[in-house]
Amino acid sequence: MALSRSCLPAAPLKIRKRGAQLIEKITVIGGGATGHAAAAIYADKGFRVTLCDGERFAGRFKQIEANGGILLRGKVHAIGRIETATTDIEKAVAGAQLIAVHVMSPRHEEIARKIAPYLQDGQHILIVPGNLGAFIFRRVFDELHMTKKVTLTEQEGNLCPCRLTQDAEVTVGLPL
């Protein structure tokens, strides 16, 4: 089912801390339900969003591009028109001010190792759910002698309860 292109996203939210860079581009790493939901929600709020994960998610990503976005159903009704869905981690990380890692904690080390070579000074990494993932990321970055100045943060719990009901469609269980 192709999504209507008549709904345009709102202007990007102004996320700014004194003297900090405005966040406009977000990369979501995680091709599961929470990654899809987060990418769609951020895109619906007006952010430029890239969704990224491994090759096993390539089919889902092709469907997102074919549909023109990710459909949110349930307690949130919107179409998240993400810019790119890719398996290319280097492309996904490049230029993102925020990298939101929405994967299960057993994958934290894998993701830290994959993104480390491509990180840039000033990027922010948000790990969701955290489960002390910031410690894993820091340990991996130290082992790899990664010298880029990035900010590591984490959030306990997922952004919202959700279920991937079909490719390019997520049902959200609570209002945001």
Where are the language model's segments positioned?
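Rossmann-like NAD(P)-binding element
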Residues: 77-119, 123-126
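Acidic, Ala/Val/Gly-enriched low-complexity intrinsically disordered segments
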Residues: 2, 10-11
